[in-house]
Amino acid sequence: DADGTARLLRHGGIPLEDLAHVLADHGGIVAAAPTAQPGVPMQAPGMTESHYAPMVPLLLVTTALPAGVTECALLAPDRATLTHLEGLAAAAGANVHASVALSETLDSVAAAAHLFERLHELEAALISRAVPAARIIAAPYPEGGLGSAIADRLRRAAATPQ
């Protein structure tokens, strides 16, 4: 900023914690608002709330599928969480048409590298089957380090387009 303070506009490949450590002797760093604010020019690309929203609605789920979800694809941070989502889908009686884990063991570098590829795969699987009212069900990604950037992208993908 004009006052010399470093400002993180969007979480990305270098975790905020690492930036804070490097910039500690230079005034530190503050995180900007995660989305564009009304009446304020957008500070960086990708700051709209639904910037990453796929054509098939994405829902972030931790404990149960929302009522009425009967057709879905599943996206999880790791294999263990994917097994959990599969159990939630089975409990809800939902048909699962495709499922993927971003990595086997919460490898945030691998997850970040494959996030959009996996989202497109799930979206294509549901669209190619012409599954009506289908949803992509995703588990939130754990915050911290590169995980914060992945979690941010998933929240934006789940946002209703403006």
Task: Please place each PLM-identified region on the residue numbering.
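Active-site-adjacent structural elements in enzyme catalytic cores
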Residues: D1-Q162
